[in-house]
Amino acid sequence: QHKDAIYKQDKGIKNYDNSVGYNKYNFRANIDANLTKSTIIELGLSTEIVTNSFPGYANDTKALWQTQANLTPVTVPVLYSDGSLPAYGASADQQNPYILLNYTGYKKKNETTSSIRLRLEQDFDQWIKGLKAEATMSINNYSALTQSQTKTPALYYAQGRNKDGSLNLIEKVAKTDDKYESTNL
């Protein structure tokens, strides 16, 4: 199962993959064998691999949808004419959806769940009528790896234009360097 998000992202801005999406792969195998007339063995294997990808600002896309819902198309430009990133809001520190998608980095979470089930059945009917024995063993494993490269871009508030026509920008949010994290579970 592969699902890409419907967001339009600029692929040329950065040198890493910040795509938003969900991938899920399932594998299942059941093997039953009669080892002898009185011995049956069953083996069940299953694995599920899930990869979730998000923008760097959060572990989901909720903030992106909230930001999008609170903005009209004319509230704030995607970018200022000089390429600076705009801030908006009462304290001029909020980011538009374009910035959240393209300038905050990425987070990827890979999860793997595996199960092995082994069942052995022995029929002792040849020695004692109706006697059977059964043994079952099961092993489950879960692992997760989360990797992220997050950052905050510099955001500016435009107070108008200077006499030469350039924007009069005030930095409202300072840029932070990339922060790399990796967590295993």
Language-model segments: which ranges?
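Residues on the lipid-exposed face of transmembrane beta-strands in outer-membrane beta-barrel proteins
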Residues: 29-33, 116-122
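Extracytoplasmic loops and strand-loop junctions of Gram-negative outer membrane beta-barrel proteins
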Residues: 9-15, 95-105, 172-181
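Short loop/turn motifs that connect adjacent beta-strands in outer-membrane beta-barrel proteins
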Residues: 5-8, 38, 123-133, 146
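Flexible loop and strand-edge segments within Gram-negative outer membrane beta-barrel domains
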Residues: 1-5, 18-95, 105-111, 144-146
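Membrane-embedded beta-strand positions of outer-membrane beta-barrel proteins
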Residues: 43, 118, 133-135
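Outer-membrane beta-barrel transmembrane domain signature of Gram-negative proteins
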Residues: 73-87, 151-185
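Phosphate-/polyanion-interacting regions in eukaryotic proteins
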Residues: 134-143, 165
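Flexible, surface-exposed loop regions and adjacent strand-edge segments
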Residues: 12-18, 58-68, 149-159, 165-167
